[in-house]
Amino acid sequence: ELVDSVSKGGNLLLNVGPRGDDAQIPTPQLDRLKAMGAWLRDNGEAVYGTRPWSFAEARTDDGAPVRFTTRGDRLNVIPLTAVGGGELVVRGVALSGLGVRLSDGCPVELRAEGDATRMIFARPQTGAFAPAVAIDGGAAATP
């Protein structure tokens, strides 16, 4: 929800309330906040201080949503899924250039293929959901 909202110029309102009997945050809410914090620690550059790009959303070959944000001359591509293997195809936007996976600095090659982008990761993703990929200054987009 956070990435989807930010990619469209919005904010995410968190409704977290402590229990009345002991003023503790319920475990399910706390777990979700911790998971969001861990993701932001690795990928926050794709969220904080960003703006929507000319395309807010796209889909992968298998139908998973992809979101885009931008800051200055950096484009962030954020597939809202785990990337199994070393490649991911994003439909509806053709990008080319080189990027980097924010969570670990892994190089990512972007190849335009018709109306799609093939993202080729130098190393497989390890565990993280929604790996943000940053492309500095050189992403050419063909809608």
Residues of each region from the PLM?
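Mature catalytic domains of secreted/periplasmic carbohydrate-active enzymes
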Residues: E1-P143
